[in-house]
Amino acid sequence: MIPIVLQTDFPNLKLVNKGKVRDIYDLGEHLLIVTSDRISAFDVVMNEGIPYKGFVLTQISKFWFDAFSDIVPHHLVSTEVDDFPAETRPYRDQLEGRSMLVRKAEPLPIECIVRGYLAGSGWKEYRQQGTVCGIALPPGMVESQKLPEPIFTPSTKAELGAHDENISFEKATELCGGDIAAQAREVALTIYGRARDEMAAKGIIVADTKFEFGLRDGRLMWIDEALTPDSSRFWPQDEYRQGGAQPSFDKQFLRDYLETLDWNKQAPAPTLPDDIVLKTSEKYLEALFRITGLKP
């Protein structure tokens, strides 16, 4: 079994960013992204690690980066520790299976979300205003209903512990420049369409997903993670029923459990029972197998 990694500690490497899930180290020409087994819900990081989570996210990202490299360049160089610079080798046990050596890029100041179904914050806004990120939708739609066509709904990038905010495409063009925003929208919609079709053949609905892009030498590059259970809503096709919330292959199971608690959704996080940790791990592993055919 792969060891659970909650924190990384690499004294001779330069830590440049510690996110809710990933630790990023600067290796000079490249970055090293280490995906821990931390899990967050409602923007609060839980105390417990989820077995295999970092492995699952890394392997799924590699699968999609490789699959769609014809659409847009991506930042992934290798997930094999043997390909990493020599100074990383002492930490092989913590890096194996959960790390990516990546090219550097300047991240865009927005997150690029594509929605194919009415769920989450999109459903909440639609109920109140009949729109999603200002995009008008037909009246009378219900929760989890398929949209007439996928829509691009960017958001801001919030600091750790804060909430992202949905923004209009016009605001995205102000933040990124019109040409870059338009290119990011086109690429995101293209990748989503391909992934939706490939996943449908595997019995999975991609309800929505979040992309991050950066610029390298002035060219758009796909960065961060790729169509993982942390950045996407994956629903089992055979259980899909519009008109309510759906079972999923992501951390929605954990969110649903936390909703049953008397917790204000602020730190400190409540203690997670062993069965909830195990069931969450099983959800991630099922997503890995359904998408890639891999088992750890």
Swiss-Prot record:
CDD domains: SAICAR_synt_Sc (cd01414). One of its GO terms (molecular function) is ATP binding. One of its GO terms (biological process) is 'de novo' IMP biosynthetic process. Keywords: ATP-binding, Ligase, Nucleotide-binding, Purine biosynthesis. SUPFAM superfamilies: SAICAR synthase-like (SSF56104). Signal peptide: none annotated. Its EC number is 6.3.2.6. It catalyses: 5-amino-1-(5-phospho-D-ribosyl)imidazole-4-carboxylate + L-aspartate + ATP = (2S)-2-[5-amino-1-(5-phospho-beta-D-ribosyl)imidazole-4-carboxamido]succinate + ADP + phosphate + 2 H(+). The keyword Transport does not apply. Pathway: Purine metabolism; IMP biosynthesis via de novo pathway; 5-amino-1-(5-phospho-D-ribosyl)imidazole-4-carboxamide from 5-amino-1-(5-phospho-D-ribosyl)imidazole-4-carboxylate: step 1/2. Transmembrane segments: none annotated. One of its GO terms (cellular component) is cytoplasm. It holds the Pfam family SAICAR_synt. NCBIfam families: PRK13961.1, purC. Belongs to the SAICAR synthetase family. This is Phosphoribosylaminoimidazole-succinocarboxamide synthase.
